[in-house]
């Protein structure tokens, strides 16, 4: 959905969930915050002055490793049985991996409990890890693409790349 379609479909009763930030200025489309009276904020960063204060629910836990950990906890401990699709469980696991730098930074018991729950949901840990691996050949191709890129309007980089079947990880 593009910005216009989202704005057209929203009304005062639409539930807007803001994840991994509580700062109004970090929301990609801040105008969405004005279109609804129902906002939920899920974040693991320390509270700042630019807080989204009109939320009906704020789940902010600075001791959590990631917003993905918090979302996993919400799903895991809900009273209704939730069947989490594997791809969504893998996306949450990837979020935890990214924010913890492969479970080495800012991890706690809750982090590993969330990861264990996602594992029980059937995730393929090797597949998720491969999403973030790059070999030397891929790194060199990416370097070439970046080297040939052009900057426009001082903020946008554009590069052309001849996509080949074996290069799908670069897309």
Residue ranges and their predicted role:
Residues 4-7, 27-31, 58-61, 81-83, ...:
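A generic local secondary-structure boundary/capping motif
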Residues 35-39:
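A short helix->loop->beta-strand "cap" motif at the edges of active sites that frequently abuts
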Residues 44-114:
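Short alpha-helices
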Residues 1, 7-15, 93, 98-171:
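Hydrophobic helix-and-loop "lid/oligomerization" segment in the mid-to-C-terminal part
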Residues 8-11, 31-34, 51-52, 84-86, ...:
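Solvent-exposed alpha-helices and their adjacent loops that cap or buttress functional pockets
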Residues 18, 41, 97:
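Generic enzyme active-site microenvironment
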Residues 1-34:
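N-terminal small/polar loop signature for handling phosphorylated ligands or for N-terminal nucleophile
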Residues 5, 21-24, 45-47, 163-165:
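Short glycine-rich anion-binding loops that position phosphate/pyrophosphate groups of nucleotides
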